[in-house]
Amino acid sequence: MLEYAHSAQPQQSEEAVIPAMKILLATDCYRFQTNGITSVVLSLEDGLRNLGCEVRVLALSSSRKSFRDGEAFFVGSHLVNQKQEHRVSFAFRDPLLEELAAWRPDLVHIHTEGTIAMMAKRIAKKAGAPVVMTTHTDFEYFYFGRFRASAPVKALCRLYGRITYRQAEKIVVPAEKSKSFPHLAPYQDRIVVIHNGIRLDRFQPPLPPSARSGLFASVGLEDNGRTLVSVTRLSREKNLIEILRFFPSLLREVPDAQLLVVGDGADRDRLEAFCRENGLSTRVRFTGMIPPEEVCRYYHMGDIYVSASMFEVNSMSYLEAQACGLPLVCREDESLRGVLDDGVNGRIYRNEREFVSAVSGILGSEALRQSMRAAALDRAEDFGIGRFAERTLALYRSVCAARTGEASPAPKEKSVHF
């Protein structure tokens, strides 16, 4: 099992200095959705281009219309589950797919298991290109909840994984936690750990005071140095309701504490109703969906980043928050390994008492807050986009080199048709 961990530097070779690969990234989530997968793909796209790669992206359109926007190819899709915001596409003969196959990528990197993955695999087969897949989601937790540990569920997930990842020559996971997912059990020898990366320059310039004050006014909160921020998709598995339930206890310790929730999703109505019913509406504000390029401004409104999710694999929001100098206060979870050191760049909590103690302790000590801020900024440096892209490109080259060594590829046809 290979690992491209954040503590290791990729070995530089003479070949790797001149990267000129043609890479196709395939994803369901891109531009039209604000979530972790979108952030990963955008970061990887930018990083690979900075290394000299030609990059194109295949993604689902937010409507039934297919179109091309620069190097991004969007195929028409249908909304099949509004609650979970799932879209699928059946446009397997879309001319855009033929155009991508004719472009002949050197490698196809798939960031989804949905219908886009099926399209991308067909493109790879036509182009004679190897496939790398990244798994971003704990499917067992997402779909089966408390039944995920049962033998039938594990068997079903192993079968699903055997079919889904069969064509992938390597499977990228963003954290150690992912290795134990049942759907990856059939291909343990193909797993590579590459931690996600972010564009640090997008997050580190602080907001000018006038812009900061304007943002606070726009959401109806005070710029009082007591603001908690959570950037998340509003769905049940993110467990934001737990923080809302803890908030009255926090207000007894820190009466002027307030929470800014950045993001949208199917659970928003329930969360807002809880705030109204419990008298929290003046202390908790929901922004709705914010464009990815604007999210950094909202991180900078906060003094602490909070999360109750146990669904994360390698959360982009944890990295982005630290790049903005925010200490983290997160529910205990294996995904925090290597990201959050308890007492150094934030606090880990297990119950309501620990949550209140962690938040009030940081807000009550300027020295502690500044120490954790410095540690957060330092930790974020380990997850920069440059290192992320270098490690990923090193994997691409090793996959292509292994394939070349095994056998000479068949001559490619002059025309490609689906």
Labelled PLM ranges:
Residues 310:
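Aromatic "clamp/platform" in nucleotide-sugar-dependent glycosyltransferases that forms part
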Residues 327-330:
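Short hydrophobic beta-strand element within catalytic cores of glycosyltransferases
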Residues 217, 221-247:
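Conserved donor-binding/catalytic core segment of Leloir-type glycosyltransferases
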Residues 342-353, 361-366:
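Conserved acidic donor-binding segment of nucleotide-sugar-dependent glycosyltransferases
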Residues 2-73, 414-418:
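N-terminal subdomain of nucleotide-sugar transferases
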Residues 272-290:
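Nucleotide-activated donor-binding/catalytic signature segment of Leloir-type glycosyltransferases, i.e.
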Residues 177, 197:
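Carbohydrate-associated surface elements
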Residues 164-165, 289-290, 297-302:
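Short alpha-helical donor nucleotide-sugar binding micro-motif in glycosyltransferases
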